[in-house]
């Protein structure tokens, strides 16, 4: 079985790198060792290292576990909360009288 190749756009990679750096800084500010955070999050030390590097191959659940250990899980809820583009698209559809199609089962 061949390994699946993941293509990451440069902007996406920068965002992930920044997220990883922010997580690492939060850990260091709390004076928590990587070993302690990994243990409390129930993940391996290499997985935490990958998270702190912004790896796209780590599950979003693992990112959330680390954020919980650091007391930052509420930040996770802010992702896509204010969907400005989605609201504009919805308003544009309402203004033109378009309706959302219902799926018929």
Description of each model-found segment:
Residues 55-67:
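Short, basic-rich loop-to-helix N-cap that marks the start of a DNA-contacting helix
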Residues 31-49:
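Short alpha-helical DNA-recognition segment
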Residues 21-36, 97-104:
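Short basic helix-loop element that most often maps to the first helix and adjoining turn
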Residues 77-105:
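Short, charged recognition helix plus adjacent turn
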Residues 5-29:
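A short, Lys/Arg-rich alpha-helix, primarily the initiator
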